[in-house]
């Protein structure tokens, strides 16, 4: 006899409780059922059945269900082995143990993964500090003295690292300390068979970990292009750049996507001369207008931006880097390589057990995070999904639900994305070209920020909000923005996309004044009105 706890969605009244209870009671082997509409839950006592049968019965009755916990004899506890210890790994471990599983987590490097140690957290600290330094000399407000502050980069790095260590302890190490169902192993894992991992532990011992389910959550690392001379040069990746205690005289940034733009602009704001070198255009995967606007902003701040530039060779002598980019010969004292990231899947033995990967080594998963081997799941930057920590965490949680017999899909159709330049860059949904490729007959409107009252009050009208909608119905398809606080604005757009709102719906909503998010309302109104002819706050 075991007890299975289910999360139930879709119940709105007492009749719903009754319908769910009848559906569960009708499953052979069920002896007792308690359903709570208020708690969105059901407790089922049963013997000789799998949780999947209970989930299926609830779904057949017209409601949603997933397994939240399964209690039984210790021998029944599902064993989940997780390779990695970042956002995806911890989200999965927490959810799996909530469902009654025991977890073995294996990490070869630093606990916590990229985001807290080398990515999101330290980069945002650096960017914020650099923005404050830049504003002191470049703000637009009369009567307030403009001056260039003294920068003590070593002190900035020390404060940044202090936050990294505090968050690693609070959000990762303490979870392990307080969850007895998670066993942590420091070491390097490789599949010995579809059912077992061999672990070369950091203490020199070898261990075999056998499990019922496996999650690959090993993240990604900077990808370095095969440019002649680059491998022998002492270039920076994002990790070295974020930890650097000196400000370069001239920083050359190889790559024009998120990491390169964020860190490069931060050093620009701290006083470095910066040159961006991109093989294609800036942010080639985003709406083309975004790259063009960001280039104008960077050049106005004093950066040099080279696009469609093919670097033929790199050399470094006496502390100076030399880049041959055809007609352009560049020289600088530091080189940041920010040309993308590659999955950390080498050495895991995936091909030997039949786990399919793409050409870049990313694990191919379906919407339920399953790999080509049914009991092996993957989540986070090591997969073929977008490389954002919140996507990784959501994927890890859903993978755990599915490993425990539930049914949780990861829907990325309204995924918000943010790049933390100044102003910020954000998007959700389809670009205009993507909508055309899907034959959705899109139309678009672009609202420059001199039409947004908050931007006028900030004396910073750089950027725009662009909306893409289905021409026939007005259904919102995508939102793309370059704006101050665009990262805050975009979540409202993502919710509108999720709700299948039209531009007319958005244009008629109440938005607070003066806020940057009001730009969404104003942009939506441009599909039918000339917003320049409207009064402030016009509804």
What are these regions (language model features)?
Residues 146-147, 182-202, 209, 270-367, ...:
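A Rossmann-like FAD-binding core segment of flavoenzymes
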Residues 81-88, 92-109, 121, 125-135, ...:
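Flexible, glycine-rich terminal cap/loop adjacent to redox cofactors
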Residues 1-81, 87:
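Flexible metal-binding regulatory segments at protein termini and peripheral loops
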Residues 120, 216-273, 277, 304-305, ...:
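Glycine-rich dinucleotide-binding loop and its adjacent helix/turn
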Residues 231-248, 329-403, 488, 492:
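FAD-site-proximal beta/loop scaffold in flavoenzymes
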Residues 76-77, 87, 94-101, 106-247, ...:
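Glycine-rich flavin
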Residues 81-83, 189, 208-219, 253-254, ...:
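Short hydrophobic core segments
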